[in-house]
């Protein structure tokens, strides 16, 4: 089974040129948006993708560059189109997403809008379980280290592709993924500047064996990315708006 992924944004939280790091996954006619940051609605508009063409949104954690566009989705879907789409949320984040990120803008007691489920078909996902999002598309949540004390997740898609979302460098995990057969491709966030903070840095990723680097495509980078082309070892930088096809064949 193949997957297509179009990066509607490839930038870090503060990138202005490359937009927030959000991905549109296409599989068997289903379009899943991985994260919906502040720039997501504009990015989709520029690509000519209507929000009514999005079948579901999957959230990896609750920073604004990953959830800041959900309010616009909620209002437009409800009041302009009168429709509901699936919102896939890690079970540990369902309440925090509403209480700490969306409630201030979306709650409207006068209209009986008091919870996330009043806007979306909310599907809570447990970690370390393979979930079928759509026939032919599975997702497994992998707990990641990003911000201490805050739940954050990477994703395994179809046991084919590892999508880090936001994660600190984990040498052992990346080597294990590459040698265990759990995936064939790795899309990893990459902080270009030092020192390391809450993302893997390019220098850290360059310590990986070349065989692992060859599996990695870099995303969630700073606006200065072009200065680092040719300096990323065997790894390549993903391009904003480009559609990539990932197949089981090597």
From Swiss-Prot:
User: How many cofactor units bind, and how?
Assistant: Coordinates 2 Zn(2+) ions. One protomer coordinates the metal ions and the opposing protomer provides the catalytic residues required for cCMP hydrolysis.
Q: Which cofactor does it need?
A: Zn(2+)
Q: Which Gene3D superfamilies match?
A: Ribonuclease Z/Hydroxyacylglutathione hydrolase-like
* InterPro entries the record matches: Anti-Pycsar_Apyc1, Metallo-B-lactamas, RibonucZ/Hydroxyglut_hydro
Q: Where is this region: Beta-lactamase-like?
A: 19-220
Catalyzes what?
3',5'-cyclic CMP + H2O = CMP + H(+); 3',5'-cyclic UMP + H2O = UMP + H(+)
Keyword line: Hydrolase, Metal-binding, Zinc
The entry's Zn(2+) 2-binding residues are 61, 63, 146
Q: Which domain of life is it from?
A: Bacteria
GO terms of molecular function:
hydrolase activity; metal ion binding
Residues that hold Zn(2+) 1 according to the record = 65-66, 166, 220
Q: What does this protein do?
A: Counteracts the endogenous Pycsar antiviral defense system. Phosphodiesterase that enables metal-dependent hydrolysis of host cyclic nucleotide Pycsar defense signals such as cCMP and cUMP.
Report the family membership: Belongs to the anti-Pycsar protein Apyc1 family.
Q: Subunit structure, per the record?
A: Homodimer.
Q: Write the protein's name.
A: Anti-Pycsar protein Apyc1
């Amino acid at each position: 089974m193949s997957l297509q992924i179009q990066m509607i944004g490839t930038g870090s939280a503060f990138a202005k040129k490359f937009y927030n790091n959000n991905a549109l996954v296409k599989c068997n006619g289903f379009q899943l948006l991985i994260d919906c940051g502040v720039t997501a609605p504009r990015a989709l508009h520029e690509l000519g993708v209507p929000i009514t063409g999005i079948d579901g949104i999957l959230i990896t954690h609750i920073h604004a560059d990953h959830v800041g566009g959900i309010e616009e989705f909620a209002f437009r879907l409800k009041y302009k189109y009168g429709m509901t789409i699936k919102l896939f949320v890690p079970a540990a984040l369902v309440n925090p997403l509403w209480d700490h990120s969306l409630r201030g803008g979306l709650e409207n007691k006068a209209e009986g809008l008091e919870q996330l489920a009043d806007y979306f078909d909310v599907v809570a996902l447990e970690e370390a379980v393979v979930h079928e999002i759509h026939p032919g598309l599975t997702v497994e949540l992998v707990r990641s280290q990003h911000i201490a004390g805050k739940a954050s997740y990477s994703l395994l898609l179809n046991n084919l592709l590892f999508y880090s979302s936001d994660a600190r460098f984990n040498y052992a995990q990346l080597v294990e993924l590459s040698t265990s057969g759990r995936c064939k491709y790795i899309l990893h966030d990459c902080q270009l500047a030092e020192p390391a903070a809450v993302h893997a840095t390019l220098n850290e990723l360059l310590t990986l064996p070349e065989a692992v680097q060859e599996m990695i495509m870099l995303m969630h980078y700073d606006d200065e990315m072009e200065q680092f082309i040719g300096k990323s070892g065997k790894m390549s930088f993903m391009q904003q708006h480009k559609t990539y096809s990932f197949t089981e064949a090597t």
